[in-house]
From Swiss-Prot:
It is found in: Plastid, Chloroplast. This is Pentatricopeptide repeat-containing protein At2g15820, chloroplastic. InterPro entries: Chloro/Mito_RNA_Process, Homing_endonucl, LAGLIDADG_dom, Pentatricopeptide_rpt, TPR-like_helical_dom_sf. Belongs to the PPR family. P subfamily. The lineage of its organism: Eukaryota, Viridiplantae, Streptophyta, Embryophyta, Tracheophyta. It comes from Arabidopsis thaliana.
């Protein structure tokens, strides 16, 4: 029923229906409403939607929205997608009778393996480029948003004109709020709304939020919505949350979109298909932000398993391309997700494009344990679909067969690659070298390496690494030395992996003098690394040069970038015990007890005898679990920088999640140091070899971390403790800076922080107590504390003794600032982008933009 007389313009839509066409009615306020006609015949032909309830959420120039929902467990609710053109709001809806099953990853998607780097040297053909753009364009997925089928519809919805409100004062105040709210920042906006608490109702706040969305002030609309949810009169509004989430998602505000999305889930409701679709696209549009791909996969999986939806082909393809394009990775998660996407495309009857087959074969070939059967199955399906195998597929096959050591299959695949007449990528030569190394034919491997040099005009870095590794295993000393010299002269980097292989070979052959020369050359041309130090230390202890071994050990211990490990301690301890140096052995033993390193069983027997003479008891087990002072200070800095704590409230235990960024130079160095410092606290599965420490590992679950969980992660969210000023030592500040700080191009220092505004103020005051002035801005949920000029120099002077040696040059502020440390001039910090906070929200010393 619709009335357009300007005094009682109310529209109520009920029932579940198939929207087939629409017409427009103009109200007296000159706003145009798009009203949808119903295809009644579809109800009888489609019994699945007879019990469905429906919702239409309309956005008018001045329209008040009231949402009444009636819930039925068996009914499907969907909000129709709409777009705004000028003064007209159009709604698009496509009926659908299909009921998709809940899918889980099939058995073929659960194979183990690791995801490795992309093929190098492969250039796409024009055909390949066009195909890649066709199957993986995020823009195509974004364009499909408006065409997403809507199968969850609310029961009843009412749209009223602003003029229909009986109280004139309410109309005036609402109009005034609609004008004022978009002009204010977050804190002032909340104060403004709080001042209206006495008269504002949910319908009023909903109207303001929708008005903000209509004028494209979506973040302001979100703030009004968030304020509304904190009021005691608030009732969940599915229509409003759906509209808000989709508007935020279309602007790529994935964090706020996810908050609203989670609000729907927390109410026991299933978001609409369009909301799922938009949120996935928002994440895929921000892949440069860490963790967005994982979140996109999580939402995609929920879309299918929880919502029972069948996504558009463009969404499948976009997510698949993002998985294939991801650099690096751990375990076989990417393969499982890719198999799940492939399974969904096939079972829903969508077209499987050529690049999907190619990408899936490529992912399988990257695994440590290759499933040749699955690869052959995909090849058969690819042929049935009428696709020819491209160069990328053939190279993937070459890699897979090389890992299995199948020389015959490699040669046959090599001929196929030659027949394609599209050039041989350098990585194909590396795979062929690996295949022959598996069968011990190093002469053939060397021949292939020389062919690569002729074919591409010089060997690649990966080619040098592979051939040197192969020849070191068969101990071809002269040939290895010749190749290493060529490698150094070529100027290619990194050299460290090859130096480590050569050092191992020299140690096995007993060529300790050559090993020492290789060690010295490595330090001159590469950054210091614990693996090469450990090999050199083993060599010194084996030849009995314990004095020099002690010096090298002390150098490792004093350099936080290298640090000592259980292996280096056991190596030196064995040397001291074999030579009868009991005093030095006791010192190493005490160090191992302090660091809680395990002592090798043969050494325990010797220690037991030596210490029994002095009536000392050998501690078979480490001390009771307790963090040292240094560990506590490091943990405070890391927690401020974003370290996460996962809690099990039932068992009252907590687990630290150590996570590092692969694309951060500071994190590459820092993860080694953190792994060594917290080794005794790490989960047994996290005790990896020194040279393959992952970018993510966990501590053991322990009640000792309860203090940190209570103060830094209450209720599973980051928070800043009230007593942070007591715990903010220079050591903690240094690790905070190394973990999440940034040095700008101008040499200023910016620190990243999550928590409440009050907590940030406490941190700012703590810095001011150390004579450092700072400015703060907020972006999303993250605060950025900036120190510029003299302030950055003072900060650096405070933390420099605790910064890892290899990071000092990388993190050191501008030299001009250091020259002016003694000047007391106050520096002003200007973050160019505006924040969500106004200047009046904090004290006068630390300004929030």
């Amino acid at each position: 029923m619709t009335k357009s007389n300007g005094h009682n313009a109310t529209m109520i839509v009920t029932g579940a229906c198939d929207f087939s066409s629409s017409f427009s009615l103009a109200s007296s306020s000159s706003s145009t409403v798009s009203v949808t006609t119903f295809n009644i015949s579809s109800l009888s032909s489609n019994p699945n939607i007879i019990n469905s309830s429906s919702t239409l959420f309309r956005s008018l120039s001045f329209s008040l929205i009231r949402h009444r929902s009636s819930y039925s467990r068996r009914s499907l609710r969907r909000l129709s997608i709409h777009t705004v053109h000028g003064n007209k709001t159009q709604f698009f809806s496509h009926s659908s009778t299909r009921t998709p099953p809940l899918f889980t990853a099939n058995s073929t998607a659960q194979r183990s393996g690791t995801f490795v780097e992309h093929l190098t040297g492969i250039t796409e053909s024009e055909e390949g480029i066009s195909e890649a753009n066709g199957f993986g364009d995020v823009e195509s997925a974004r364009n499909d948003i408006r065409n997403v089928a809507t199968r969850r519809i609310e029961t009843e919805f009412e749209v009223r004109e602003l003029e229909e409100l009986p109280e004139e004062w309410r109309r005036s105040k609402l109009a005034w709020l609609c004008k004022e709210v978009p002009t204010h920042k977050a804190v002032t906006l909340v104060r403004l709304l709080n001042a209206q608490k006495k008269w504002v109702r949910q319908e009023d706040a909903t109207y303001i939020s929708v008005h903000c969305m209509r004028i494209r002030e979506n973040e302001t609309g979100f703030r009004v919505y968030r304020w509304m949810t904190q009021q005691n009169w608030y009732r969940f509004d599915f229509g409003l949350t759906t509209k808000l989430a989709e508007y935020l998602g279309k602007e790529r505000k994935f964090t706020k979109c996810r908050e609203v999305f989670d609000d729907v889930l927390n109410q026991g409701r299933v978001p609409s298909e369009s909301t799922f679709h938009i949120l996935v696209v928002a994440y895929l549009s921000s892949l440069s932000v860490e963790g967005c791909l994982e979140e996109a996969c999580s939402v995609y999986n929920r879309m299918i398993q929880l919502g029972g939806y069948k996504p558009r082909l463009s969404l499948h393809n976009s997510l698949f391309r993002a998985l294939v394009s991801k650099q690096g990775g751990i375990l076989n998660d990417q393969l499982k997700q890719a198999e799940f996407i492939f399974h969904n495309v096939v079972t829903t009857g969508l077209e499987v494009q050529k690049d999907i087959y190619s990408g899936l074969i490529w992912l399988h070939s990257c695994q440590d344990e290759v499933d040749i059967g699955r690869i052959n199955s995909l090849r058969e399906e690819m042929k049935k679909a009428g696709f020819q195998e491209s160069k990328e597929v053939v190279v993937s096959l070459l890699r897979a067969y090389a890992k299995e050591g199948g020389v015959e299959e490699v040669e046959r695949t090599w001929l196929e690659l030659l027949d394609l007449d599209c050039g041989i990528p350098s990585q194909a030569f590396v795979y062929k070298i690996e295949a022959y190394s598996k069968v011990g034919d190093f002469a053939k491997a060397m021949e292939i390496f020389r062919e690569m040099e002729k074919h591409i005009g010089g060997a690649t870095m990966s080619g040098y690494h592979k051939i040197i590794e192969v020849l070191c295993k068969v101990q071809q000393v002269e040939l290895v030395e010749t190749l290493m010299k060529e490698f150094e002269e070529s100027g290619k980097k990194p050299l460290l992996p090859s130096f480590i292989e050569i050092a191992k070979m020299y140690f096995d052959l007993g060529l300790h003098e050559k090993l020492e020369m290789a060690f010295v050359q490595c330090l001159e041309k590469c950054q210091p690394s614990q693996p090469i130090y450990n090999i050199y230390l083993d060599s010194l202890t084996k030849i009995g040069n314990l004095e020099k071994a002690g010096d090298v050990f002390n150098e490792m211990k004093n350099n936080g970038t290298i640090n000592v490990s259980a292996r280096s301690c056991n190596s030196l301890l064995k040397g001291y015990l074999d030579c009868g140096k009991q005093v030095q052995a006791e010192r190493i033993y005490d160090l191992m007890r302090m660091k809680k390193y395990e002592i090798e069983p043969p050494l325990m027997e010797k220690l037991d005898y030596i210490l029994s003479l002095k009536k000392k008891e050998v501690k078979k087990r480490p001390f009771s679990m307790k963090l040292s002072k240094d560990q506590r200070e490091v943990l405070v800095g890391l927690l401020l920088g974003g370290l996460q704590i996962e809690s099990d409230k039932e068992k009252k235990s907590h687990m630290i999640k150590f996570e590092f960024r692969e694309n951060s130079q500071a994190h590459l160095v820092l993860k080694q140091n953190i792994h060594d410092q917290f080794r005794e606290w790490l989960h047994p599965l996290s005790n990896f070899q020194e040279d393959i420490i992952p970018f993510e590992f966990y501590s053991v679950p322990h009640s000792y971390f309860g203090f940190y969980a209570e103060h830094y992660w209450p209720k599973g969210q980051p928070e800043i403790p009230k007593l942070i000023h007591r715990w903010l030592s220079p050591h903690s500040l240094a690790y905070w800076y190394m973990y999440s700080g940034v040095k700008t191009s101008s040499g200023d220092i910016i620190l990243r922080l999550k928590g409440s505004l009050e907590g940030v103020e406490k941190v700012v005051k703590a810095l001011q107590a150390k004579s450092m002035e700072c400015r703060v801005k907020k972006k999303g949920k993250v605060f950025w504390i900036g120190l510029q000029g003299t302030n950055s120099a003072l900060f650096w002077k405070l933390i420099e003794p605790h910064v890892l040696e290899n990071l000092k040059e990388h993190l050191k502020p501008a030299s001009e600032s250091l020259d002016n440390v003694k000047e007391a001039e106050e520096q002003s910090i200007n973050f160019k982008s505006n924040s969500d906070h106004s200047d009046d929200c904090v004290n006068s010393e630390a300004h929030f933009y």
